[in-house]
Amino acid sequence: MVWLARDSCVAAVILLLTVLSPPVALVRDPTPRFLEQVKGECHFYNGTQRVRFLARYIYNREEYTRFDSDVGEFRAVTELGRPSAEYYNKQKEYMEQLRATVDTACKHDYEISESFLVPRTVEPKVTVYPSKTQPLEHHNLLVCSVSDFYPGSVEVRWFRNGEEEKDGLVSTGLIRNGDWTFQLLVMLETVPQGGEVYTCQVEHPSLPSPVRVEWKAQSTSAQNKKMSGVGGIVLGLLFLGAGLFVYFRNQKGQSGLQPTGLLN
């Protein structure tokens, strides 16, 4: 589990990191179109049995130096970060504070948030569809879309006629939605044959059992017949509804008429 710093303790550490940034870290042109970022991350493994704190400096999407609590000091990621790493590592009091962040910030915040974050689960939504519409026996890409789930641990497997497919798989990798949910696309490259059944199976901690969604390879004529059948049923129901409406309206009109003899 990874938490980005949004609370007061870790945010204070990030603020201190920014204030202590050496001038050498900004040797490039600091015009508005460039972006400097500092990210504090608490990594938890099996609760708080093992906790790792990272302070990452990023310039224009490129990380150039970082503090790693497992290492105990700053290490340069690129040549740009070497002067910064050397500068920070000489600040003894500051380095002691960073090394203590695992206990003073990460573990502290975990205890506060554990009750509502760790047990939280959201079931994934699973859909299967071909990437393009074309006749059978042509190369196609079947897409299994797994969306809006939490936590991020998920396993997606493809089957053809009950046999697992391990070749021809393409995945987008885990995508963060920004609202504590994730999404993932796992695609299968194949040449569908008539009558074949493709199944996407999804396993996730929120599910009591795996979810299986099927896609059946059908010829264009079979699909047209199926759509014609569905259209016929819908049309029949419309005529039936119209007939019942006319019938009950006539019945109501007749019940409202009184016999002529009673008017005299």
Curated annotation (Swiss-Prot):
Ig-like C1-type domain location = 124-228
A GO term from the CC aspect:
MHC class II protein complex
Claim: Disulfide bond is one of the keywords in the record = yes
User: Which keywords accompany this UniProt record?
Assistant: Adaptive immunity, Disulfide bond, Glycoprotein, Immunity, Membrane, MHC II, Signal, Transmembrane, Transmembrane helix
* Disulfide-linked positions: 42-106, 144-200
Q: How does it sit in the membrane?
A: Single-pass type I membrane protein
User: From its record, what is one biological process in GO terms?
Assistant: macrophage differentiation
Q: Where is this gene product found? A: Membrane
Region annotated Beta-2, chain positions = 121-215
State a single Gene Ontology molecular function. CD4 receptor binding
Q: Read off the Gene3D superfamilies from this record.
A: Class II Histocompatibility Antigen, M Beta Chain, Chain B, domain 1 (3.10.320.10), Immunoglobulins (2.60.40.10)
Q: Where is this region: Connecting peptide?
A: 216-226
Q: Enumerate the transmembrane spans.
A: 227-248
State the residue spans of region: Beta-1: 27-120
Cytoplasmic compartment spans: 249-264
Which residues get glycosylated?
46
Residues annotated as signal peptide = 1-26
Which stretches face the Extracellular side? 27-226
Q: What does this protein do?
A: Involved in the presentation of foreign antigens to the immune system.
Sequence similarity: Belongs to the MHC class II family.
Q: What is this protein called?
A: Rano class II histocompatibility antigen, D-1 beta chain
Q: Name its species.
A: Rattus norvegicus (Rat)
